[in-house]
């Protein structure tokens, strides 16, 4: 409801369970939890991101950040000649979001979602520059569909869950994806995770849990183990940590 805002409630618990069960390889419980959220949370997939590029209308729970816009403006809005902002080069943008020429069916690539700077050939996400909620999504509804798409053994049915999100985002049914095997299933999920959760962090976890070492849109990047491990804080080293602990991680 509107009263709860984006606090961690019953539906958020089920959404988190769906995520954890999926991570653990427990498809039965992952499916049950994801279906519970889709059927009973009252949220629906959106086909319009105008004035809501991060799609709070689909947000199950979020982390509040006081004065978020001001705190992040140098990265997502203001800045001196693109020296501080987290922009993406147009060439990589087109590969990342599968944009061909001027063809932009996907609303996640349009001007409501990205500001494109033609002279520098860069694009900048609007997710944190247009953010009246001052919140960072932790779990959004599309992830529940992706969990169903990943954990449903019937590949035809699994593809329908992925296409449900794609169709809402602007893709016509004529370009619906199909899964012929586990490899094509994962490849399609890879593409949708990176498009849907750009600048939200979820794609990093997708890459990590699937052990993906190469990016399909950037051959120059190799995902080594170091890219998936956060540096140990110095404070933890002061309280008994030794190098031998690495062997148990």
Which ranges hold each PLM region?
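Acidic/polar-rich alpha-helix caps and helix-coil junctions
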Residues: 1-91, 98-249
């Amino acid at each position: 409801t509107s009263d709860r805002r984006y606090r961690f409630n019953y539906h958020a618990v089920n959404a988190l369970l769906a995520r954890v069960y999926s991570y653990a390889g427990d498809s039965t419980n992952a499916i049950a939890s994801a279906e519970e959220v889709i059927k009973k949370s009252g949220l629906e997939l959106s086909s319009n991101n105008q004035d809501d590029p991060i799609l709070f209308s689909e947000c199950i729970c979020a982390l509040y950040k006081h004065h978020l816009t001001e705190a992040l403006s140098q990265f997502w809005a203001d800045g001196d000649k693109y020296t501080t902002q987290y922009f993406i080069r147009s060439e990589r943008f087109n590969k990342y979001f599968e944009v061909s020429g001027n063809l932009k069916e996907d609303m996640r690539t349009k001007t409501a979602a990205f500001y494109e700077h033609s002279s520098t050939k860069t694009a900048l996400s609007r997710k944190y520059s247009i953010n009246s909620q001052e919140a960072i999504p932790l779990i959004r509804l599309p992830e529940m569909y992706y969990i169903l798409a990943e954990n449903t053994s019937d590949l035809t049915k699994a593809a329908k869950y992925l296409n449900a999100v794609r169709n809402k985002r602007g893709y016509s049914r004529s370009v619906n994806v199909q899964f012929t095997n586990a490899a094509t299933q994962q490849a399609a999920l890879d593409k949708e995770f990176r498009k849907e959760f750009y600048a939200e962090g979820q794609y990093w976890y997708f890459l990590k849990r699937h052990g993906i070492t190469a990016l399909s849109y950037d051959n120059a990047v190799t995902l080594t183990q170091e890219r998936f491990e956060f540096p140990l804080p110095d404070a933890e080293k002061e309280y008994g940590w030794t190098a031998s602990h690495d062997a148990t991680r």
